[in-house]
Amino acid sequence: MRPSKRAADEMRAVSFERGISKHAEGSCLVKFGDTHVLCTASLEEKVPGWMRNTGKGWVTAEYGMLPRSTGDRMRREAAAGKQGGRTQEIQRLIGRSLRAVVDMQALGEVQITVDCDVIQADGGTRTAAITGGWVALHECLRWMEARQMVRVEKVLKDHIAAISCGIYEGEPVLDLDYAEDSVAETDSNFVMTGKGGIVEIQGTAEGAPFSEEEFANLMKLARGGIDRLVSLQKMAVA
């Protein structure tokens, strides 16, 4: 039995609140149960130096956790003087995931930075950030379209969403919260497009290795979860 009493293939309640920031071109507060992430998409009419004069744009991401997003206060990374390895890994993952569904030529020579700030953490912050980051990016492109800068459907080729799966007490389960994630035998993150394309899979065994059959079961759970997340994204931006 899962601590939350959810079925093995049941996600936490997921919601998207658009327009949460009056300053950002695109913004979204995404909630996966008790994991809450504020995603903002900011437009800059410039690109990294290595992309100048190419006619192509760029999408990047930054990720951070507020000091009291967790049970005990975390020290701000800025106060420590450097980003931790986990932070760098996650923000690179978010950026890669979003770029997988963006036509950089259609975007034009601008940069969009998607900032993902974890307000409250209860497992799955990176998957929530990717899923909510897509909504914030969509809203930024919609802002640009209203100013005749781009066509959203030309730039954004597909949806992107992410979900965690794991083996908890011997059973494959979908969308782990912290109580499950902290003791799971296997923990995996799946990033997929709306059309079912795989962008990234991260899978780790904690203790004993897992089998191909167990991985296939996790993949099946993930596909079902991604389908539901994409449906929720579609409703959020309609």
Curated annotation (Swiss-Prot):
Taxonomic path: Bacteria, Pseudomonadati, Pseudomonadota, Alphaproteobacteria, Hyphomicrobiales
Enzyme class: transferase
Family membership noted in the UniProt record: Belongs to the RNase PH family.
Role description: Phosphorolytic 3'-5' exoribonuclease that plays an important role in tRNA 3'-end maturation. Removes nucleotide residues following the 3'-CCA terminus of tRNAs; can also add nucleotides to the ends of RNA molecules by using nucleoside diphosphates as substrates, but this may not be physiologically important. Probably plays a role in initiation of 16S rRNA degradation (leading to ribosome degradation) during starvation.
Reactions it catalyzes: tRNA(n+1) + phosphate = tRNA(n) + a ribonucleoside 5'-diphosphate
Protein name: Ribonuclease PH
PROSITE patterns reported in the protein's UniProt record: RIBONUCLEASE_PH (PS01277)
Keywords, alphabetical: Nucleotidyltransferase, RNA-binding, rRNA processing, Transferase, tRNA processing, tRNA-binding
Subunit-structure text: Homohexameric ring arranged as a trimer of dimers.
Binding-site positions, phosphate: R86, G124, T125, R126
EC numbers on record: 2.7.7.56
Pfam family, one: RNase_PH
Gene source species: Brucella anthropi (strain ATCC 49188 / DSM 6882 / CCUG 24695 / JCM 21032 / LMG 3331 / NBRC 15819 / NCTC 12168 / Alc 37)
Keyword Manganese: no
Cross-referenced CDD domains: RNase_PH_bact
Domain of life: Bacteria
Gene3D superfamilies: GHMP Kinase, N-terminal domain (3.30.230.70)
GO molecular function: 3'-5'-RNA exonuclease activity; tRNA binding; tRNA nucleotidyltransferase activity
Transmembrane is among the record's keywords: no
GO biological process, one term: tRNA processing
